Amino acid sequence: MKETQNAREKIKQLLHILIPIFITQAGLSLITFLDTVMSGKVSPADLAGVAIGSSLWTPVYTGLAGILMAVTPIVAQLLGAEKKQKIPFTVLQAVYVAALLSIAVLVIGYAAVDLILGRLNLDIHVHQIAKHFLGFLSLGIFPLFVYTVLRSFIDSLGKTRVTMMITLSSLPINFVLNYVFIFGKFGMPALGGVGAGLASALTYWCICIISFFIIHKNAPFSEYGIFLTMYKFSWKACKNLLKIGLPIGFAVFFETSIFAAVTLLMSHFHTVTIASHQAAMNFASLLYMLPLSVSMALTIVVGFEAGAARFKDARSYSLIGIMMAIGFSLFTAACILLFREQIAGMYTSDPDVLRLTQHFLIYALFFQLSDAVAAPIQGALRGYKDVNYTLAAAFVSYWVIGLPVGYMVGTFTSLGAFGYWIGLIAGLAAGAVGLFFRLAKLQKRYSQKQHI
């Protein structure tokens, strides 16, 4: 990354960082997509088992990965402040934290997974597939968490194309391994959906090893000498990392787990309603990738400028990123409005589900408009290391406003299932307003400091 002089240079640098992040996020989601689709070719039970296992794992992973993503703003600010000598120590401490988190997940997971699956009252065959899928997947938890740290380090230097290429290389690896273990090719036993867990675990080891060699051998990463000096574990550094990482992790967890909670609360509705809701929610999740990518890019560039005490530039980046996300959101809103029948048709051919999905997509339209404001502001605030407010905003907007309002409207009015979407939209909109005022207040404070 480099210092920019005008808005045109800022837009160019932001896009240079943003586009690879977007492709990376899409690539990571495709791994889960491949697991689910290829497992579904074996049997409905395999599809259900993998889908349930993935739905349990995703909130846990995204929340804990959020903790490790604290590396991005920390390293970006060290880079901006020209304190490069502190970066290897910071990255290695994050790897130690990744190892501790891996151990914690393995211990708790092995103790609790049977209990959790038992509470879901699943068919015994589906229960066993989900259990063993998660068991095999757990073999890749440590490399996945270490990769998250290494990816955050690479991204913080503005070299997001590198992580993009690593992620894209993982897709054919995952596809081939799925083919081998799910269907039993090249002398391997046919494990069905369970094999998708093993394939994903081995894929995580591959991308971790690839990242390690890139950091060790290729400039500019090799210039930092990561892993050349094995620093001792530091509780102080760990606490500093967790001080920023825990609020990020919990905020991400609150965001991802709310959708699972809504789906569970909607379980008493007709199958057609649930299927339509899931289709619209899946499409909304796909649209969320862009504001999420803008958010991650803003964390990098705002952190870089804030670390260099160029607060005016940090503010400009924030505004550009927010406007970029809103512009894309308005475009996708128009597409939903005009092509909602075709969008619904990608998910189903059932006429009842098709009709109802189109109605849900109208709510998805307003949902993603709120996301376009909230997500980039969260990223900008994290660039300033202002993470506690984003945690509070995520909790209040989803769990204090969104879910209760959704439950009340969905249960006690004629809107039914649509009420849950109204609740989520109301909560997210309220959170976006709160985040906007927080960012404005923070930037005003830093602007005053710059003029002193």
From Swiss-Prot:
Q: Where are the transmembrane segments?
A: 14-34, 56-76, 97-117, 129-149, 164-184, 195-215, 244-264, 284-304, 319-339, 360-380, 392-412, 417-437
Its main localization is membrane
Q: Which InterPro entries match?
A: MATE_fam, MATE_MdtK, MdtK-like
Please give the superkingdom of this protein's source.
Answer: Bacteria
Q: Which GO terms describe its cellular component?
A: membrane; plasma membrane
How would you describe this protein's topology in the membrane?
Answer: Multi-pass membrane protein
Q: One GO biological process from the UniProt record?
A: response to antibiotic
Q: Recorded GO terms, molecular function?
A: antiporter activity; xenobiotic transmembrane transporter activity
Q: Keywords of this protein's UniProt record, alphabetized? A: Antiport, Cell membrane, Ion transport, Membrane, Transmembrane, Transmembrane helix, Transport
Cellular compartment(s) = Cell membrane
User: Its biological function?
Assistant: Multidrug efflux pump.
Which family does the UniProt entry place this protein in? Belongs to the multi antimicrobial extrusion (MATE) (TC 2.A.66.1) family.
What's the protein name? Probable multidrug resistance protein NorM
Chain's gene name: norM
